[in-house]
């Protein structure tokens, strides 16, 4: 943003432009080609679908059998969820967990009920469903000094269940804070001593990606690969999980082919070569928000919104001049296609698809007989996002580093969490009521927690790369300036509000005024995917290594049957 000029016909050659040096797309036409062959169902596909339905009936019988103990049922539910199959049995699982909830205190509160795995697993399953049950049940596993009993260390599966349960803690739950420290220490020790045991893979995975912070497809893919090692595994579940994963993968391949064709037709690679070409990575992110086949419409809409947001972010962050960025923010605020010719040519290439995407969603919803007010809420959220983008560029232009608190007042909006949350509701159907959108517009705990996680995680992993060029101030610089500390100290200190934000999200999921769980899950899942992609580096921007491997696993390589 070196030269302040006004342009209405595209940037003239004399205008100085920044470049972030983003690597090009690593996928090319890969998914367009693969979807062409996958779009037609084969006899093999039909046989697999028939097989899935037969296996589904067997599993349903297991869930509804009246002679199964509660302990066996909760273990069955856990396996079903980890294998990515719970969307097939939502009603059955809900009924069973309601029964567990009603008998929870009586059943698990007894001092002689000392099965740590049983108690911790039940606690986690209920908290996941939004039941605000007490963590006091774990006090019986502590000694007279309030410390967890050392003999628990021998129960590795129980320790692992307690570790996973501790990640659903809310503010003030000291017993779960102690549980997390206790289990983390001893599970690491277990790994060092037993690196090749049957439970080692599960423990190793949990320590890196706790279930609460992981998303379905990657949890399922991993659990399918290790499930056969455990003496409690059930072959019917494993067969169904493999079959289901591959069938869902084909659904995603077809959708990705459509999305990739849409993106290719927009020709951003040639029209806006400075921007990140990451439509496949966006789709991967959004399958983490909703992977189930029934969510095709919201998946398509949110992928398009996120992909276009990425382009507009790069216009603000990398390429635009101050006057052009004001024009773009003003155009987004007006949300009016008639002003298209007043914009710089390169800006038009992003502005028109943005308006078209929202208009198409609105038309589709109207044709389906659904209310369209959600589109208006999403537009307003996008307008606030553009205002925040503009404010950050003004800081850059003035070479101004705000205080950490001032930075967050803008950066929590520019993180995009609220806009993505609102947009994730838009195509969810009648469950996304006006009241749900109003609730989200008031920045509840779960939504604010998402914004904190996105913003601070992004700033930490992207700091080194972004410091190589003129860039808007990040949380790292602002924290260093406000507290006069090194960047290493800033990195460590910024983890604290991220931990707090996860507790906020957990608490928000238990709030009685929160909307239905299917909506809350979208917000939570946005954070889960980010936690996976931003593991040590920005796996969205720099997607040619680890992210490439993950996407290959998710969308290209089927599971051998």
UniProtKB/Swiss-Prot annotation:
- UniProt binding sites for Mg(2+) 2: 313, 317
Name the gene that codes for it. Answer: STS1
Its recorded name reads Sesquiterpene synthase 1
Which residues are recorded as binding Mg(2+) 3? 458, 466
Q: What is its EC number?
A: 4.2.3.13
Single GO MF annotation: magnesium ion binding
Q: Catalyses which reaction?
A: (2E,6E)-farnesyl diphosphate = (1S,8aR)-delta-cadinene + diphosphate
**Subcellular localization, as worded in the UniProt entry:** Cytoplasm
The Swiss-Prot or TrEMBL note on domains reads: The Asp-Asp-Xaa-Xaa-Asp/Glu (DDXXD/E) motif is important for the catalytic activity, presumably through binding to Mg(2+).
């Amino acid at each position: 943003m070196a030269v302040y000029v006004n342009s209405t016909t595209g940037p003239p050659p004399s205008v100085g432009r920044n470049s972030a040096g983003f690597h090009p797309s690593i996928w090319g036409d890969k998914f367009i080609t693969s979807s062409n062959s996958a779009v037609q169902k084969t006899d093999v596909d039909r046989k697999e679908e028939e097989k899935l339905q037969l296996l589904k009936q067997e599993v349903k019988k297991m869930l509804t059998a009246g002679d199964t103990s509660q302990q066996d049922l909760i273990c069955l539910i856990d396996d079903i969820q980890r294998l990515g199959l719970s969307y097939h049995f939502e009603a059955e699982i809900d009924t069973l967990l309601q029964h567990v909830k009603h008998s929870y205190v009586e059943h698990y509160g007894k001092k002689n009920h000392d099965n740590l795995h049983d108690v911790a697993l039940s606690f986690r399953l209920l908290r996941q469903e939004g039941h605000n049950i007490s963590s006091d049940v774990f006090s019986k596993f502590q000694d007279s000094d309030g410390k967890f009993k050392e003999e628990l260390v021998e129960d590795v599966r129980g320790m692992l269940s307690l570790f996973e349960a501790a990640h659903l803690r809310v503010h003030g739950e000291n017993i779960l804070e102690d549980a997390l420290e206790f289990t983390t220490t001893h599970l690491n020790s277990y790994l060092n001593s037993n690196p090749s045991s049957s439970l080692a893979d599960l423990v190793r995975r949990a320590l890196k990606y706790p279930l609460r912070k992981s998303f379905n497809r990657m949890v399922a893919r991993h659990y399918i690969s290790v499930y056969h090692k455990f003496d409690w595994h059930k072959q019917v579940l494993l067969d169904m999980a493999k079959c289901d994963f591959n069938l869902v993968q084909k659904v995603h391949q077809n959708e990705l082919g459509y999305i990739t064709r849409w993106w290719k037709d927009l020709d951003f690679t040639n029209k806006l070569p400075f921007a990140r070409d990451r439509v496949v990575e966006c789709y991967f992110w959004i399958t983490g928000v909703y992977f189930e086949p029934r969510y095709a419409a919201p998946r398509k809409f949110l992928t398009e919104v996120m992909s276009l947001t990425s382009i507009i972010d790069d216009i603000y962050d990398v390429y635009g001049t101050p006057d052009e960025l004001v024009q773009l923010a003003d155009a987004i605020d007006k949300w009016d296609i008639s002003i298209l010719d007043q914009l710089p040519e390169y800006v038009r290439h992003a502005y028109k698809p943005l308006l078209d995407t929202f208009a198409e969603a609105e038309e589709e919803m109207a044709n389906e007989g659904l209310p369209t007010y959600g589109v208006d809420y999403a537009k307003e959220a996008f307008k606030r996002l553009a205002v925040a983008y503009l404010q950050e560029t003004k800081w850059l232009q003035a070479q101004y580093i705000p205080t950490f608190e001032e930075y967050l007042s803008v950066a929590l909006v520019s993180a995009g969490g609220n806009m993505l949350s609102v947009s994730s509701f838009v195509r969810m159907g009648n469950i996304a009521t006006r009241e749900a959108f109003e609730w989200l517009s008031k920045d509840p705990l779960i939504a604010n927690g998402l914004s904190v996680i996105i913003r601070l995680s992004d700033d930490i992993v992207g700091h080194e790369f972004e410091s190589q060029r003129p860039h808007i101030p990040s949380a790292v610089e602002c924290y260093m300036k406000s507290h006069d500390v090194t960047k290493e100290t800033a990195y460590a200190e910024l983890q604290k509000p991220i931990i707090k934000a996860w507790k906020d999200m957990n608490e928000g999921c238990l709030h009685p005024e929160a909307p239905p769980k299917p909506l809350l899950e979208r917000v939570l899942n946005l954070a889960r995917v980010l936690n996976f992609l931003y593991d040590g580096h920005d796996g969205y921007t720099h997607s040619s290594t680890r992210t490439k491997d993950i996407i290959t696993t998710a969308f290209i390589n089927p599971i051998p049957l």
